[in-house]
Amino acid sequence: MNKTELLHEGKAKKVFLTDNKDLVIQEFKDDATAFNNKKKGTIGNKGVVNNAISCKLFTYLAEHGVSTHFVEKLSDRDMLCKRLDIILVEVVVRNTAAGSLVRRYGFEEGFRLEDPIIELYLKDDDLDDPLMNESHAVALGLANYEELELLKEQAATINTLLKTFFAGRKLNLVDFKLEFGRHNGEILLGDEISPDTCRFWDLDTGEKMDKDRFRFDLGGVEDAYTEVQHRVLDLP
């Protein structure tokens, strides 16, 4: 499968058309951004690491009944995917208080939530991806109420599966972001699942092992990403 034309370039990936109108190639970059593109840099080998992790996790989710855009891994940086009409709603699932949940509501960082919190955000960098509810999403024409309920149900299912997966690898899945899209009338999980889109803390030490190391200049960014890759790919 060959790349024919650049369809879209985002902060972390490029998406290329192929000779099959239903399939695209997602190429992972080493570029890193934070705070809605206000901070920019690179993380060595990030594209390779995130592609490997995402391929493994999409395969795991598919084996447990979750419909995703993933088709196959093509190379170190390239993933073959079903072409999606992206729904401009970011679904965030929170298991432990961190990030904007702490800033917005005053939770103590690290507070374990009794039940996961599922949030919806408008996918719009110019507006700083604002928090919204279902009524906003419907009014904006992004999805209907039935579709939004499906997104939340899928997010809850994915959360249960991933929490179990990562706990077995001594990682606390603090929170994570999901994106979905439409493909031939079906809603599929898209984008990626990686230290770019998830917060991971070591279960024993609480050490941050995700893009927060880049956001807040904690150092050891490449080592943290590589360690997550090791635990995801190499541990049973």
From Swiss-Prot:
What's one GO MF term for it? ATP binding
InterPro entries for the chain? SAICAR_synt/ADE2_N, SAICAR_synt_PurC, SAICAR_synth, SAICAR_synthetase, SAICAR_synthetase_CS
What SUPFAM superfamilies does this protein map onto?
SAICAR synthase-like
Q: Name one GO biological process term.
A: cobalamin biosynthetic process
Query: What is the top-level taxon of the source organism?
Result: Bacteria
Can you state which reaction this protein catalyses? 5-amino-1-(5-phospho-D-ribosyl)imidazole-4-carboxylate + L-aspartate + ATP = (2S)-2-[5-amino-1-(5-phospho-beta-D-ribosyl)imidazole-4-carboxamido]succinate + ADP + phosphate + 2 H(+)
Coiled-coil ranges (or none): none
Q: In which pathway does it act?
A: Purine metabolism; IMP biosynthesis via de novo pathway; 5-amino-1-(5-phospho-D-ribosyl)imidazole-4-carboxamide from 5-amino-1-(5-phospho-D-ribosyl)imidazole-4-carboxylate: step 1/2
Name the top EC class: ligase
Assigned EC number: 6.3.2.6
Query: Which UniProt keywords are present, listed alphabetically?
Result: ATP-binding, Ligase, Nucleotide-binding, Purine biosynthesis
Q: One matching Pfam family, short form? A: SAICAR_synt
Enumerate the NCBIfam families for this protein: purC
Record HAMAP family: SAICAR_synth
Similarity field: Belongs to the SAICAR synthetase family.
Q: What is this protein called?
A: Phosphoribosylaminoimidazole-succinocarboxamide synthase
